[in-house]
């Protein structure tokens, strides 16, 4: 029997990247998936791929910062599939990160919008999912955090704080609703080469980032999706309230770089001074 046979999952931010990989992974193991994304066309494309693989999915265009839209999302999931068993809170205000700066340079509108999506939106989804999970005898939630929620950075203040708060939200949910057979964990990815990230990085920067991974490769959305699927499944039935890093060892080593600059420490044989600066 497939791990998610008979289960209904809601995945937010599922039109691309990690969210899409999670939706596909759940569907491939028998789950019925509600694919939610701000970009409706991306959500439809994801459901089309699931359907092409003989899966069952429903696309919804919505903004998780909108409480009414979130309520409609879960009402639709219940009406269409009969309930909700699994939730992946992956949607994030990534479009704001170029303007998400150090504290004194930070536009408070960026802070407010980031918190509205990353934190409040996650809370809204959890509040809609929990009663429906209780009605079905329990469920599992994975909140998509980040390694940036576990260590300081020279910029992206709002994003990092929102992810740190998400970690505590996950622990609080696990504590408050474990008696109802609801598990909640956070997943903290490191450098994951999504299509969106690859489009922003030139070859030189890709080389620089790859050089500072402990493993001889970068992460991919499918790596994160495999972890998420495990945490949602009965294979992880005694795991709850945890923040699980999937970062290729990014946070396991020293030194870190307080100025955000480049290092020659990872220079490999054959690198010139110029390529080391890349």
From Swiss-Prot:
Organism domain of life: Bacteria
Record keyword Ribonucleoprotein present: no
Cross-referenced Pfam families: adh_short_C2
Residues the entry annotates as binding substrate: 146
Record EC number: 1.-.-.-
Class of the enzyme per the UniProt entry, highest EC level: oxidoreductase
Listed GO MF terms: oxidoreductase activity
Keyword Ribosomal protein assigned: no
Active site: 159
Homology family: Belongs to the short-chain dehydrogenases/reductases (SDR) family.
NCBIfam families listed in its UniProt record: PRK07231.1
Protein name (database record): Uncharacterized short-chain type dehydrogenase/reductase y4lA
Species of origin: Sinorhizobium fredii (strain NBRC 101917 / NGR234)
Lineage, uppermost ranks: Bacteria, Pseudomonadati, Pseudomonadota, Alphaproteobacteria, Hyphomicrobiales
């Amino acid at each position: 029997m497939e791990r998610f046979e008979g289960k209904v999952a809601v995945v937010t931010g599922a039109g691309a990247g990690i969210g899409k990989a999670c939706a596909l992974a759940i569907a491939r193991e028998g789950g019925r998936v509600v694919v939610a994304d701000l970009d409706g066309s991306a959500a439809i494309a994801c459901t089309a791929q699931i359907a092409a693989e003989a899966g069952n999915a429903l696309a919804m265009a919505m903004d998780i910062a909108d409480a009414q839209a979130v309520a409609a999302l879960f009402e639709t999931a219940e009406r269409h599939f009969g309930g909700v068993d699994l939730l992946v809170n992956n949607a994030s205000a990534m479009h704001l990160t170029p303007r998400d700066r150090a504290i004194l340079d930070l536009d408070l509108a960026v802070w407010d919008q980031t918190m509205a999506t990353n934190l409040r939106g996650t809370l809204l989804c959890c509040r809609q999912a929990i009663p429906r999970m209780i009605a079905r005898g329990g469920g599992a939630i994975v909140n998509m955090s980040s390694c940036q929620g576990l260590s300081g950075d020279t910029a992206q203040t709002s994003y990092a704080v929102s992810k740190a708060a998400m970690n505590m939200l996950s622990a609080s949910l696990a504590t408050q609703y474990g008696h109802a057979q609801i598990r909640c964990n956070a997943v903290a990815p490191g450098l994951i080469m999504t299509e969106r990230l690859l489009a922003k990085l030139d070859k030189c920067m890709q080389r620089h980032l790859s050089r500072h991974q402990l493993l001889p490769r970068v992460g991919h959305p499918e790596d994160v999706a495999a972890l998420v699927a495990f945490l949602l499944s009965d294979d992880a039935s005694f795991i709850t309230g945890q923040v699980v890093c999937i970062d290729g060892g990014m946070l396991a080593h020293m030194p870190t770089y307080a100025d955000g600059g480049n290092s020659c420490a990872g220079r490999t044989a054959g690198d010139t001074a110029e390529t080391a600066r890349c």
